[in-house]
Amino acid sequence: MSRPTLAWYGALALLATGSAHALVSSCTVSASGVAFGVYDPTVATATFSSGTVSVSCVVSGATGHNPITIAFDTGSSGTFTSRTMLNATDFLNYNLYLDAAYTQVWGDGTGVSLTYNQFVTPGKPSFSATVYGMMPALQTPGSGTFTDTITVTVSF
C-alpha cells in the first residue's frame, strides 16, 4: 500500500495594490496539508481529501476593500493538467481544485487553472479557503510514501 501525502509551503508575494480608502500592509498565509491516506490501487473509485489555506492581512483605513489572490504552482509535475506525487521513480497522479465538484483546477490562472480571489476589508481582514484534492483510481505505483510540494503565492 502507498501512503501519499502533500506538503504545503507558503510563499508570500508582495504585489501591493488596493483602494484609496483601505490599504493592506502585509499578509500571512498558512496551510494544512492534503493527506490522501493509504492508497489502494484495486479500488475503482477516486480518492478524495481536503485541506485549508488561511490568509490574515493587516488592513488600515476605515473603509474600502482590497483584492487578494491565492495561486498554487504545479509542484513536481510542471503542469496543471495532472499533478504528481513522487517516491523515487514512482509517481501517483492527483490534482487540487477550488470546488467540491472537482472541476476547477487550482493553479496560477494559466492553462486549465484558476486562482482563488477574495476581498479583505478593515472589518474582515482574514479568510480561509478549502483546497479539494482528488487522486484518480486504478493507478499502479510501487509501495512507499509519495509526496509533492506546492508553493502558495498570495498577492495583494
Task: Locate each region found by the language model.
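Bacterial N-terminal signal peptides that target proteins for export
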Residues: M1-Y9
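Intrinsic disorder/low-complexity segments enriched in polar/charged and small flexible residues
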Residues: G10-A11, D108
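N-terminal signal peptide c-region/cleavage motif recognized by signal peptidases
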Residues: T17-S19
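N-terminal small/polar-rich segments of proteins
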Residues: H21-A88, Y116-F156
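Charged, amphipathic alpha-helical segments and their flanking helix caps
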Residues: T89-N93, A101
